[in-house]
Curated annotation (Swiss-Prot):
Protein name per the record: Queuine tRNA-ribosyltransferase
Any one annotated GO CC term: cytosol
Active-site positions on this chain: D90, D270
Oligomeric form and interacting partners: Homodimer. Within each dimer, one monomer is responsible for RNA recognition and catalysis, while the other monomer binds to the replacement base PreQ1.
Keywords: Glycosyltransferase, Metal-binding, Queuosine biosynthesis, Transferase, tRNA processing, Zinc
Enzyme Commission number(s) from the entry: 2.4.2.29
A Pfam family per the record: TGT
Reported cofactor(s): Zn(2+)
Pathway linked to the protein: tRNA modification; tRNA-queuosine biosynthesis
Annotated binding of Zn(2+), by residue: C308, C310, C313, H339
Gene name linked to the record: tgt
Length: 376
C-alpha cells in the first residue's frame, strides 16, 4: 500500500491511497457492505454507477455466515462479491460492543455469542487476522477494546492498555504471517482508543505510532458522546497521529461530521447512515434532508435534488419515489440508496477539490449556508 498527501489546506488533507485493487482519492467515504454487499446494491452499482473505489465489509458477520473459509474458496471477498476494487474489513470489535449483552472482554480477547444461533466464539488479535486473511481484504483492522461513553477513567485505562497489547500482538503476528507468504498484499491499521479522555488518546496514539501499521484509525467515537465532544476529541488526538499514514475515523457519520472532521485532518470515513436512512425514506440533498414519505411529495415532479447528477435524480421524480416507498416496492431501496451514496461520495469529491485550490474554509461556509437543519 502507498499513501501520499499531495495537498494541505489548514489541517485538511488531500491524498492518494493505492492498494492492490484500486487507487483511492482521499478524503474518502467508504460505503458499508456489512455482509459483503451494500444493502440493495450489487458490484455493478458500486463500481459502474457510483464509481466507489473502496467499500467496508464486516469480519464478525462474514465469520459467522457464510464463514471466512467459504469466502476464501470463492477467491476472497473480491471473487465472492465480484466487486474488484478495494475492501476494508473491520475486526468485529464494534459488533461485540454493540451486542455487549452477549459478550465478555478479557485480556486475551472477546468472547461472544452468535446473534444467529447462540453459539459461543472467541475473537483474539490473531484469530481476527486469520479470518481477514481468508477474506482477502486490502485493509485489515486490528481487534480493539471499545467502551461505551461516558466511561469511568478506570475502564478507559483498561481499554487503552488492552488495545495497545492487542495491537502489538497483531502487528507481530502479521509480520510473521507475511514471512510465511500470507497476506502479502494486505495492509493492517491500528486503532486508537481512549474515549473522550485526551491524555488517554494521546498515550494510545503515541504507542501505536511506534508500531509499523500501514494506517491509524480513531475508534470509540459516535457511541454516545455529543458532536462537540467528538470533534474536540478528534482535534486533540490528531497532532499525535503520524502524518505520513492515512487517518481513519470509524463509524462516522452525518454530512456535517464528514466536513468537520476533514477540516481536522481525517482521510477516511465509513457509516451505514446513507443507506440506512435511504431505506427509511430520508434522503440527503445539498439543501438538507427530505422525508420522501411526506404527503407533500405525492404530486411533486422534481427530482430529489435539482442539483444532483445521480442515477436516480436524472431519471425519477419525488412523486414516483414517494409512491414506491408507500407501496413498499423493493425498487425504492435501490434508487434511494444510489442517491444517498452518490450524495456522500460527491460531497467527498467537492471537499477534495476545495482542498486542492486552498478554499476549504469557503467550501465549509457555503456548505452550511445552504443547508436547513430541519427535515424538509
Amino acid at each position: 500500500m502507498k499513501f501520499e498527501v499531495i495537498k494541505k489546506d489548514g489541517n485538511a488533507r488531500r491524498g492518494i491511497l493505492t492498494t492492490a485493487h484500486s487507487v483511492i482519492q482521499t478524503p474518502v467515504f467508504m460505503p458499508v457492505g456489512t455482509v459483503g454487499a451494500v444493502k440493495s446494491l450489487d458490484a455493478f452499482d458500486m463500481s459502474e454507477i457510483l464509481d466507489a473505489k473502496i467499500i467496508l465489509a464486516n469480519t464478525y458477520h462474514m465469520y459467522l455466515r457464510p464463514g471466512s473459509k467459504v469466502v476464501r474458496e470463492f477467491g476472497g471477498l473480491h471473487g465472492f462479491s465480484k466487486f474488484d476494487r478495494s475492501f476494508l474489513t473491520d475486526s468485529g470489535g464494534f459488533q461485540a460492543f454493540s451486542l455487549r449483552s452477549n459478550t465478555k472482554n478479557d485480556d486475551g480477547g472477546i468472547k461472544f455469542k452468535s446473534h444467529i444461533d447462540g453459539s459461543t466464539h472467541y475473537f483474539t488479535p490473531r484469530s481476527v487476522l486469520d479470518t481477514q486473511y481468508e477474506l482477502g481484504s486490502d485493509i485489515m483492522m486490528i481487534l480493539d477494546d471499545l467502551v461505551a461513553l461516558p466511561a469511568e477513567p478506570k475502564r478507559i485505562d483498561l481499554s487503552i492498555k488492552r488495545t495497545i497489547k492487542w495491537a502489538k500482538e497483531a502487528i507481530d503476528y502479521h509480520k510473521f504471517m507475511q514471512s510465511k507468504g500470507v497476506g502479502l498484499q494486505q495492509n493492517i491499521f491500528g486503532i486508537v482508543q481512549g474515549g473522550t479522555d485526551y491524555e488517554a488518546r494521546k498515550f494510545c496514539a503515541e504507542a501505536l505510532n511506534e508500531m509499523p501499521f500501514d494506517g491509524l484509525a480513531i475508534g470509540g467515537l459516535s457511541v454516545g458522546e455529543s458532536n462537540e465532544a467528538m470533534y474536540d476529541t478528534v482535534e486533540a488526538v490528531m497532532p499525535f497521529m503520524d502524518e505520513l499514514r492515512p487517518r481513519y475515523l470509524m463509524g462516522v457519520g452525518t454530512p456535517e461530521d464528514l466536513v468537520e472532521n476533514v477540516e481536522r485532518g481525517v482521510d477516511m470515513f465509513d457509516c451505514v447512515m446513507p443507506t440506512r436512512n435511504a431505506r427509511n425514506g430520508t434522503l440527503f440533498t445539498s439543501f438538507g434532508k427530505i422525508n420522501i414519505k411526506s404527503a407533500k411529495f405525492i404530486n411533486d415532479h422534481a427530482p430529489i435534488d435539482p442539483q444532483c447528477q445521480c442515477y436516480t435524480c436524472k431519471r425519477y421524480s419525488r412523486g414516483y419515489l414517494n409512491h414506491l416507498f408507500k407501496a413498499r416496492e423493493l425498487t425504492f431501496f435501490r434508487l434511494a440508496s444510489l442517491h444517498n451514496l452518490h450524495y456522500y461520495l460527491n460531497l467527498m469529491k467537492e471537499m477534495r477539490e476545495a482542498i486542492e485550490v486552498g478554499e476549504f474554509a469557503k467550501f465549509k461556509r457555503n456548505f452550511y449556508a445552504k443547508r436547513s437543519t430541519d427535515e424538509l
